[in-house]
């Protein structure tokens, strides 16, 4: 499989991933405050790839910033920058309301998760917002839930009250009771988000009739779920793997017109220590403790 530079532009940060022979070999993350610096980093990563003229694919939940980055990358490299949505379809089927618009990150995460585990699963993306999405046993994205992320919730409490301070999210101190205002806020957000995910996963399992594998990704995933028995694996770069999986499906469909772009697997797979074996980067909490 040829090389690929995958760029995921989020609300606050951009991730740049270099793929060689389906393996994610390098990742750079930068704040979005300077799109030119992000484009320069992408140019450097592109030039480091072994294949001259490697394709560049950009996904975005923040189109104004992504447009600036994509234009600058094209100017710097002379390469065509493909966009998820316009040029590359997320490699996942959906069962949603007609004309529903779903964030690219949610669909790409679903594509990567399904490619990795090949069975019903939930993807929890703990970033600026937290999303909890369900993919059924034939690889169809069924939708899910969206809620404020940890930092957004803390900021909202500060901005909409007179007395609550501005604080940054982190894991609260040990113990069930916040012994001061700051710790009480952290307890409320931290345990509240964990409880939200538990309740939603139980709700999905009851409707589906089986308990799904649960994968977590996003900047706050490790802090929220590294000690949570509900989550089977933490996959830091799931969106980048979703870009690669979607580009791979499009590439294979173009190379072999008779082959469908997305193949529905029916075999089940377990998330094992060390990952699923499909190069998606998943690792269980057992790995972290080993």
How should each PLM-predicted stretch be described?
Residues 111, 115-118, 143-186, 246, ...:
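Glycine-rich phosphate-binding loop plus the immediately following alpha-helix
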Residues 1, 91-121, 244-248:
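Conserved phosphate-binding catalytic cores of ATP/NTP-utilizing and phosphoryl-transfer enzymes
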Residues 269-289:
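Cysteine-cluster motifs in flexible loop/terminal segments that predominantly coordinate metals
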Residues 59-66, 210-227, 231:
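Glycine-rich phosphate-binding loops at beta-strand->alpha-helix junctions
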Residues 107, 162, 232-269, 280-282:
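Glycine-rich phosphate-binding/hydrolytic loop that grips phosphoryl groups
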Residues 1-90, 282:
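N-terminal glycine/serine-rich phosphate-binding loop of ATP-dependent small-molecule kinases
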Residues 1-24, 113, 120-141, 157, ...:
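Gly/Thr-rich phosphate-binding beta-strand-loop-beta motif of the actin/hexokinase/Hsp70
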Residues 28, 173-213, 223, 231-232:
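Adenine-nucleotide phosphate-binding core of ATP-dependent small-molecule kinases
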